[in-house]
Amino acid sequence: MVNMKASMFLTSAGLVLLFVVCYASESEEKEFPKEMLSSIFAVDNDFKQEERDCAGHMRECKEKLCCSGYVCSSRWKWCVLPAPWRR
């Protein structure tokens, strides 16, 4: 009975150790692609999205007009999709 408990404990400890080692090596491997992708897709100031003259979906429409395909909700003052019940 004692040998079975000891073997179960050693098996559990071995699995935990294996998990920790695999996790550590995997986290090191994950850092490299992240760094590479961030350097490839670095965003310049020239490529940043310019602010629109219209408000998109679920944006406030108090000062800006809604973009085409959206209407300003009279209740919440958000740009929403037009629907038959919103007339």
UniProtKB/Swiss-Prot annotation:
Principal cellular location given in the protein's record: secreted
Highest taxon of source: Eukaryota
Localization, UniProt: Secreted
One Gene Ontology cellular component: extracellular region
Keyword Nucleotide-binding found: no
Keyword Transmembrane: no
SS bonds (residue pairs): 54-67, 61-72, 66-79
Pfam families: Toxin_12
Annotated SUPFAM superfamilies: omega toxin-like
Description of its domains: The presence of a 'disulfide through disulfide knot' structurally defines this protein as a knottin.
Designated name of the protein: U3-theraphotoxin-Hhn1f
Source organism phylogeny: Eukaryota, Metazoa, Ecdysozoa, Arthropoda, Chelicerata
